[in-house]
Amino acid sequence: MANTVKVTQTRSSIGRLPKHKATLRGLGLRRIGHTVELEDTPCVRGMINQVYYMVKVEG
């Protein structure tokens, strides 16, 4: 199985750039405190880097 990362949304998407809101949706995050487990790929890492100030990453 591939390596995975746990991503948790820690801040609200209200008032953020539409591009950043779309990135959160692309990661599968819906609300503050919501956690998803994703494959650790360059694509996912790029999305995390774009919204680093709204998420916490483990693993």
UniProtKB/Swiss-Prot annotation:
The UniProt record lists the keyword ATP-binding: no
Top-level taxon of the source organism: Bacteria
Alphabetized UniProt keyword annotations: Ribonucleoprotein, Ribosomal protein
Gene3D superfamilies: Ribosomal protein L30, ferredoxin-like fold domain (3.30.1390.20)
Regions that span the bilayer: none
GO cellular component: a single term: cytosolic large ribosomal subunit
InterPro entries: Ribo_uL30_ferredoxin-like_sf, Ribosomal_uL30_bac-type, Ribosomal_uL30_CS, Ribosomal_uL30_ferredoxin-like
One of the protein's GO biological processes: translation
A Pfam entry, by short name: Ribosomal_L30
Molecular function GO terms recorded: structural constituent of ribosome
Family: Belongs to the universal ribosomal protein uL30 family.
Subunit structure: Part of the 50S ribosomal subunit.
Stated name of the protein: Large ribosomal subunit protein uL30
Organism (species): Aeromonas hydrophila subsp. hydrophila (strain ATCC 7966 / DSM 30187 / BCRC 13018 / CCUG 14551 / JCM 1027 / KCTC 2358 / NCIMB 9240 / NCTC 8049)
Source species taxonomy: Bacteria, Pseudomonadati, Pseudomonadota, Gammaproteobacteria, Aeromonadales
Gene that this polypeptide is encoded by: rpmD
